[in-house]
Amino acid sequence: METKQYPDMECDVVIAGCGVAGLYAALNLPTSMRVIMLSKGAVDECDSMLAQGGICVLPEGSDYDAFFEDTMHAGHYENRRESVDIMIRSSRSVINDLLAMGVDFERKADGSLDFTREGAHSRPRIAFHADITGKEITTKLLQAVRKLDNVQILEHVAMTDILTGERDGATVCTGVVAVPVDEDNSLRPADELANVAEGVHAGELFKIHARHTLWATGGIGGVYDHSTNYPQLTGDACYIAQEHGIKMEHLDYVQIHPTGLFSPQPGRTFLISESCRGEGAILLNAAGERFTDELQPRDVVAAAIREQMKQDGTEHEWLSFAPVECDVVTGHFANIRARCLEDGRDILDEPIPVTPTQHYFMGGVWVDKDGRTSMPELYAAGETACNGVHGKNRLASNSLLESLVWGRRAAWRMRTGESLAVEQAGEPALDGRHRALSADTLAIDDLARAASTQAVEE
């Protein structure tokens, strides 16, 4: 692939990453602000696209305490309580925005949202779209962003460093250094891409000067032999943060998902969603015996599988869909079934081999409740950031929600210099109606208004 060359650029906001955190941040900025977004690979090669199970939401105000406790319990009570509170109370307005952008969540016969349950959840509270929720959400947000004249997306462009300046005696971020990359170079971490000796010509580097910078570069799965992540996610923001003395937190908090589809080959591992176990799928050992409670937190289930593998002397255990109703398998888990059929296994007829696999990074670049890092004018959101909401171990389906909440909060802080107020528990109504956050018009306000008008006309 021949890479495109770019001149130095200027904008109001540069966003490194095109997952849900970056896209939603762009939508929550006014159209008067010029935004440049970078995607290290193709724009659809982000981990947000891979999220299967769903996105958590507070179904009603009475679930607040249970939702809070489930999140804290899964995180071994090492979570930042303020962050957990913000995420939960922000969930309903975020879901309404997604509905307003056309996200097609599953519904009950009466038209209300349907919810599924996953491990360590005390009740169903996860909105979903079959078993490709992340793809549905990310695709709709990307379609919305592509309608904005003020946003420019640069595909196959990697961030290699940040630009800095001085303000009131302090070092501030003033943008990023970037480089066009082909498919092979997209798998390299930032330190290699910035090193001319490693094969990147110095003349290809270019600067993007910006008032505000948002890191939304995803996780670290690319540094593992077996991961559910895209291989170009190589922890670039963490490397750059280390080089500039930017505060990081809990870099050892890496989540291993219990059920990756086993393959002896290196490369990205296909995820078998936790919602499968939430709907009744069970784990079996080599003798066909159930050996653990499948709905415990992820780290507990992963440890149980590893221990059973050690006892059995195997590289995997088995996941059986026998207890799951046939129409749930063919409907809710159609994508998972299709992928397993590629390996010659029909989950309707036989169990599939699963093994614990690197999945998520709870640590990262430290941020506050508004997504601000320790360097002024530098923000981070999504898996790149550590706002403490997940503690030591993430609760299933909190990742998409957290990314969206902090993407929006970062955008608000950039625009106003203030913290975004948080809704009361149980508000607003889950009616799919976008509610403007201020008198100033944001990009999402215009898009939601246009979508509503079109729906009425149709």
Range-by-range predicted roles:
Residues 8-11, 189, 201-212, 374-377:
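Core beta-strand elements of the Rossmann-like FAD/NAD(P) dinucleotide-binding domain
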Residues 13-37:
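N-terminal Rossmann-like FAD-binding beta1-loop-alpha1 element of flavoenzymes
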Residues 14-16, 208-218, 380:
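Short hydrophobic core segments
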Residues 41-72, 76, 255-258, 266-270:
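Conserved N-terminal glycine-rich FAD pyrophosphate-binding loop of Rossmann-like flavoproteins
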Residues 43, 240, 246-352, 413-419, ...:
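An anion/pyrophosphate-binding glycine-rich loop and adjacent beta-alpha core
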Residues 100-187, 203-204, 209, 216, ...:
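Conserved redox-cofactor binding core of oxidoreductases
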Residues 212-266, 270, 398-406:
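Glycine-rich loop(s) and the adjacent beta-strand/alpha-helix scaffold that form part
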